[in-house]
From Swiss-Prot:
This is Protein GLUTAMINE DUMPER 4. The VIMAG motif is necessary for the function of the protein. One of its GO terms (biological process) is regulation of amino acid export. It is found in: Membrane. InterPro entries: GDU. Probable subunit of an amino acid transporter involved in the regulation of the amino acid metabolism. Stimulates amino acid export by activating nonselective amino acid facilitators. One of its GO terms (cellular component) is membrane. It comes from the Eukaryota. The gene is GDU4. Residues 61-156 are cytoplasmic. Belongs to the GLUTAMINE DUMPER 1 (TC 9.B.60) family. It is a single-pass membrane protein.
Amino acid sequence: MRPLSIKPTSLDVARHATSVESFGNHRPPISPWHSPVPYLFGGLAAMLGLIAFALLILACSYWRLSTSGDDSGERVDEEKESRSGVKAASAACEEKVLVIMAGDDLPRFLATPAANKCMCGHEGRMVIFKEDGIGAGEEKMGDREKAKENEETTSQ
């Protein structure tokens, strides 16, 4: 085998690179990613960006819905409803409830809730007015048969 020839200059460079004194003067660079601060601000920026994107989508969808009503035939429907005296607000206020029944093939139905409170002030009683206007009789809700008889007698 042939001996390696090492130049004295490269040997000095190797000694200088591995000496203890060089480690004390030069530390390896510290990466900023070893700190939680960039992750914190990066996460906050991502969340704010996502919120801004969602608000932009909501604004565009609201704008699209408000402008699409002008071009469609809703004006014709509104004119027909105003002529007949029916307001669109009454149809919009009608409340529907989804009812799920067990055991059927299609167990979903839309139901209109019944009023559970009397708005006339005669709670629990049925008020029957006579046609001649002489008087009014009040009966309990359980006495529906008597109320039907009274209606039949007043109509004859």
